[in-house]
A protein has these predicted regions:
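Active-site neighborhood of HAD-like aspartate-dependent phosphohydrolases
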Residues: 198-221
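Charged, low-complexity intrinsically disordered segments
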Residues: 2-191
Length: 221
């Protein structure tokens, strides 16, 4: 069954408004009102990524902690709540995570590139997630309940919010660029139309038994 992410309560508990108008910030929380809850990694925004079925972003992130590819595939397909229960801390010792059999340093640029690609895939494939993110235009995104130490978590609040705002602003810029292109094309077409010669009405007159264009006849005089 599809989740009603715009509901005001869940399991008898009221969802909270996570937007602060004074600071113009939106706190990303699974128990927040829309769009805060849909932006949570626990939300079931399913997508495919590099051959893997991801039931949620939480599923993808938790799967990175497992070297066994079959276990990784299983966790990757899970919805958020179930995936979070599969969390382990063994990766913290050497800071190595895994993706499809490849070892990756958690603190490396390679890892940052991986999670950026995953979020981009979810953004492109999940209309629900994309719509929720674009509704936050102009807001600063935060995640107050996350762990800030990157050596202890698979994703910090800074990483999460940075990726989401980058996706949002890039998409918004692309939309505006396309709008400007379309306007430019329309204006150019209008200019071309205005430069077209006006069709002249041809009037024929009898010139000694020969029909002649009246305007052409005037030019001969």
């Amino acid at each position: 069954m599809e989740e009603n992410n715009k509901a005001t309560s869940r399991n008898g508990h009221e969802l909270k408004d996570m937007y602060d108008p004074e600071t113009n910030t939106l706190d990303i929380r699974s128990n927040g009102l829309y769009p805060s809850n849909v932006l949570s990694n626990l939300c079931s925004n399913g997508f495919r990524f590099e051959g893997m079925i991801c039931g949620s972003m939480e599923g993808f992130l938790q799967s990175l902690k497992r070297q066994d590819i079959n276990k990784q595939r299983q966790i990757c397909s899970m919805k958020g709540g179930n995936a979070r229960k599969m969390s382990v801390t063994s990766w913290q010792t050497d800071q190595i995570v895994w993706w499809k059999g490849q070892a990756i340093d958690r603190q490396s640029d390679e890892y940052q590139d991986l999670i950026h690609r995953a979020y981009k895939a979810m953004f492109e494939q999940s209309e629900r997630f994309r719509a929720a993110l674009m509704q936050t235009r102009g807001m600063v995104l935060t995640h107050s309940t996350g762990e800030d130490n990157s050596f202890k978590t698979i994703l910090t609040p800074t990483e999460l919010c940075g990726i989401l705002m980058e996706l949002r602003d890039s998409y918004d810029k692309r939309d505006k660029t396309q709008e400007l292109i379309e306007k430019s094309v329309a204006i150019e077409q209008e200019n071309l139309d205005s430069e077209k010669p006006t069709a002249r009405k041809i009037v024929y007159v009898d010139m000694g038994g020969v029909l002649m264009d009246f305007h052409a006849g005037l030019e001969l005089i």
